[in-house]
Each structure stands twice: as C-alpha cells, then as structure tokens.
C-alpha cells in the first residue's frame, strides 16, 4: 500500500462471505482516507472478495463454525478456535492495533476474544435486524456495538449501541447517483436476480419457470441479469435460451452495483448488505428471505424495508412459479408503483454509514466511551 498511515493500525475481522466483507471493505476505504493502516483478519473463503486489501494486509485466521452437538466435531471446532486465538495474538503482537472491529461470522471470534483479552479496544458491527450468533457471543465483551438494522434503544446492550447503518462500497455510492427511470410500456424491462454473494439455487429454478408462464409479448420485453451458483449456471442459462430471453447468468458479478442501478426491478434475498445496497441505490424490489436462516435475520431485514414501502416481501414457500409470474407481470406494467417503491427505498438508505462507523471506530480507538461519543465528544 503506497499511502501508509501515521494514525496507527486498525484490524477488521470478518467472516469470508460478501455479506460480512463488503461493509468491512467500505469501512477500510473510509479509514484509509483518514490516515489509518487497515488490515483484514478473515478465513480462507474470502479470497474472491478481498481485492480492496493488499495481499500482505490480509491475514487468514484459523476458525470453525459451531454446529451440531457431536462431541468429536465440537472438540475439533473448539481446537480450531483456540488455534485461531493463538494466530490472532501473534498477529496483534506484531501489528499493535489500536482497535479491532468485528463484522460477524464465526471467524471473528478468535480475533475479538484475543483483542479483548489483550486489552485492545474492540467494536462489533451487526448488519442485520437480529444479532447473529457470533456477535451475540461477543456483545458482552466489546467496548461498542454498531448497528445496521438493529432496532434503536432495544436489548440488553442498548447503552453501548450506536445505529450507524451498513457501510456500502464506493461503487454503490457511484451507482446511487443514477436516478431511477421506469421502463416505458414497450421498452425492454431489465430484471436483476441475485441471492447474495453465495447465490440462491431456488432462484435458478423458480425464475426461468415463472418466465416461461409469461405471455409471449411480455417475455419479449425481458432482459435478465441473474446470479446463479456455479452448479446451476448452465441449466439456468439453457432455460433462458430455450425461451428466447436474453440473459446474462454468472456465479458472481464484480460490477453488481452498476447492474443494480441499471435495473428496473430487483428480485433478491434479503441479507443486510443486499438490502442496504438496494436502499442506497434506490430500486424497487421483491425480497425472498432465505427460509433456513437460524436467526430469521433476513425476514427481519426485509420487513424493515417493506415497512417503508420500498419492497414487497414474499416467503419462499408461498412463491410458486404461477404467483411469481403474476408478480413479475404486475411489476412490468405498474410502472408508477415501481417508481414510488424506488423513492421509498432510497428514502431509508444511509449512504453516509461508512463515515458514521469510522467516526465511532476512531472514538473507541482513542479511548472514548460510547456515551461520550453519543454526547458529541468525538476525536
């Protein structure tokens, strides 16, 4: 990195999925602009998402997910977490960070536990409306909690919680400058479908099946961009080719914010990063929460946007191809409704979340309390 800081080192710890890493990337960008040297502690899954960090600033920490009750499996898990704790201590002794910030996921447990035990100030950011298990386990130990969709003034840790919103990456802020323009009745209708950074098998089956049920003149208007898991990519692409519908299908799009800005309608899961980007860019959406989420966090995230009038929320179990086709046809023809949804979504977006979170991070790094931060006593 060619503009290393004089403020000191801050380590960001995040699980290796886009939902955890994208807000970490956004905070890193803001902190670097303020003169901080920012490092990332993560797991091996993160390689395709960490382009915003120099290679020597990415540190893979051993970790494991706590799942099931098998004694042997649990023993292996706790052994991995202990090894991660040792990895983290060694890293922190070398880097001497002034703050460690966790973004959720089990890979954050070793760095945050190590930091708190070493007397290094700690902060966690919870993206969702319901606190995840890893953050829940850390909430009592850290100096401060930043919330994306957490309800304000609720829960046992309200006194040390600050609602900052979810930081979004620079390309999202660039895309947010593109105003929403409804498709004309005879125009191509650009549909964006994605299931978060890990894709969604359900969409790869359900969307082509629904498109097949549309009247031919409606099908002819569609231009589809769809994220699909690698194992579903070929079958989804073939389904659209058979229907004569132009479709760009891939496991991952590096330019997803630009594609969202270009879309007339979005069908997506409702992870926190997804919902945050939809609101900052301001696009009408149908949200289908992942039904197997242990904490039902996606349902809570979706409900927050639906309450503002910015999205329709449909349970996956209720979304037959027939119903999906009806909702898609309605979206293609109720252009005024989509325009109102886009405005409602944008009205609840927080494009300044990275700045607010960076303000909090600097305050905690300097030794200030959350109460002092809330009272305006900032660095």
UniProtKB/Swiss-Prot annotation:
Q: Which domain of life is it from?
A: Bacteria
Residues involved in UDP-N-acetyl-alpha-D-glucosamine binding: 17-19, 128, 169, 197, 298
* Similarity comment text for this entry: Belongs to the glycosyltransferase 28 family. MurG subfamily.
Q: Which GO terms describe its biological process?
A: carbohydrate metabolic process; cell division; cell wall organization; lipid glycosylation; peptidoglycan biosynthetic process; regulation of cell shape
Recorded protein name is UDP-N-acetylglucosamine--N-acetylmuramyl-(pentapeptide) pyrophosphoryl-undecaprenol N-acetylglucosamine transferase
Give me the Gene Ontology terms describing cellular component: plasma membrane
Which GO molecular function terms does the record list? Answer: UDP-N-acetyl-D-glucosamine:N-acetylmuramoyl-L-alanyl-D-glutamyl-meso-2,6-diaminopimelyl-D-alanyl-D-alanine-diphosphoundecaprenol 4-beta-N-acetylglucosaminlytransferase activity; undecaprenyldiphospho-muramoylpentapeptide beta-N-acetylglucosaminyltransferase activity
Subcellular localization, as worded in the UniProt entry: Cell inner membrane
Q: How does it sit in the membrane?
A: Peripheral membrane protein
Where is it mostly found? membrane
Protein species of origin? Brucella melitensis biotype 2 (strain ATCC 23457)
Q: What does this protein do?
A: Cell wall formation. Catalyzes the transfer of a GlcNAc subunit on undecaprenyl-pyrophosphoryl-MurNAc-pentapeptide (lipid intermediate I) to form undecaprenyl-pyrophosphoryl-MurNAc-(pentapeptide)GlcNAc (lipid intermediate II).
Q: Which CDD domains match?
A: GT28_MurG
InterPro entries the UniProt entry points to? GlcNAc_MurG, Glyco_trans_28_C, GlycoTrans_28_N
Task: Give the pathway annotation.
Answer: Cell wall biogenesis; peptidoglycan biosynthesis
Supply the EC number(s): 2.4.1.227
UniProt keyword annotations, A-Z: Cell cycle, Cell division, Cell inner membrane, Cell membrane, Cell shape, Cell wall biogenesis/degradation, Glycosyltransferase, Membrane, Peptidoglycan synthesis, Transferase
Q: Which gene encodes it?
A: murG
